[in-house]
Amino acid sequence: MLLRSLDCPLDPLEEQDALFDLAQALNTVGGVTTTRPSFDYVAAERAREYMHSALDRTVTLEELAHHSGRDRWSLSRDFRLLFGTSPYRYLTMRRLDLVRSLLIQGQSLVSAALIAGFTDQSHMTRQFSKTYGLSPARWMKMHRR
């Protein structure tokens, strides 16, 4: 999955999520046993709230850690445990929710992509298609019916 996106630069949060996944995989393969981890719901919720306020800009795991009061690796683990997805994926899904809302309101694809915090329309279209299985333009045609 990580190598599939090398034709375009990685979002910092996406890169950090991939590193976390790699570290977790190495722990598993290396036979590292861990006890059931405790988690910090309040820190994860602070990170989630921060992401909602920052949809229109680049967010890093360091920023999330700063706003949550937790170190970045513990926060990433807590976030996954509590919300069932990585911080990067959560942020992408909220951005796609915003894109759909903006498209329904009549915004162009370019405007919706930029307002929602994607680097460009192409990046948004790739994420939209990967998530929903169809392009934003096709989704709009289906929505208008």
Where are the model-predicted features located?
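Short, Lys/Arg-enriched, Trp-marked, Pro/Gly-tolerant hinge/linker segments that flank
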Residues: 4-68, 81-89, 93
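Flexible coil/turn residues that form the inter-helical turn or adjacent wing/linker of helix-turn-helix
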Residues: 8, 57, 105-107, 117
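Short, leucine/isoleucine-rich alpha-helical interaction segments at C-terminal helix-coil junctions
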Residues: 22-29, 106, 131, 142-143
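Short helix-to-turn junction characteristic of helix-turn-helix DNA-binding domains
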Residues: 51-54, 102-106
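Basic/polar phosphate-binding segments, predominantly the helix-turn-helix DNA-binding elements
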Residues: 52, 58-94, 113-142
